Amino acid sequence: MFHLVDFQVTIAEILIIIMRTFRIAIWNLDVIISSIVRQLFKPLTKKNYSELDDEEPMELDYP
């Protein structure tokens, strides 16, 4: 039978081996991941106020 705990331990051991191979410390890993996330989502969070100025508000008709 497949044991999920053994699988999780195996993945954790593989990650530790990879981190030791590339000499990545756990406290540096947080900085690396956050910088990657910032670079990926930078285009999504960029605000273009010039495009917003050209829009006109919507008129709502109530019955």
Curated annotation (Swiss-Prot):
Cellular component, GO, one term: membrane
Q: Which processes are annotated in GO (biological process)? A: symbiont-mediated suppression of host innate immune response; symbiont-mediated suppression of host JAK-STAT cascade via inhibition of STAT1 activity; symbiont-mediated suppression of host type I interferon-mediated signaling pathway
Q: Pfam families under this entry?
A: bCoV_NS6
* Sorted UniProt keywords: Host cytoplasm, Host endoplasmic reticulum, Host Golgi apparatus, Host membrane, Host-virus interaction, Inhibition of host innate immune response by virus, Inhibition of host interferon signaling pathway by virus, Inhibition of host STAT1 by virus, Interferon antiviral system evasion, Membrane, Viral immunoevasion, Virulence
Domain of life from the UniProt record: Viruses
Is the keyword Cytoplasm assigned to this protein? no
Q: Tell me the segments the record calls region Critical for disrupting nuclear import.
A: 54-63
The subcellular location is: Host endoplasmic reticulum membrane; Host Golgi apparatus membrane; Host cytoplasm
Q: Which family does it belong to?
A: Belongs to the coronaviruses accessory protein 6 family.
Q: What does this protein do?
A: Disrupts bidirectional nucleocytoplasmic transport by interacting with host RAE1-NUP98 complex. Disrupts cell nuclear import complex formation also by tethering karyopherin alpha 2 and karyopherin beta 1 to the membrane. Retention of import factors at the ER/Golgi membrane leads to a loss of transport into the nucleus. Thereby prevents STAT1 nuclear translocation in response to interferon signaling, thus blocking the expression of interferon stimulated genes (ISGs) that display multiple antiviral activities.
Cite the record's note on assembly.
Answer: May interact with nsp8. Interacts with protein ORF9b. Interacts with host RAE1 in NUP98-RAE1 complex; the interaction disrupts the host nuclear import. Interacts with host KPNA2.
> What is the protein's given name?
ORF6 protein
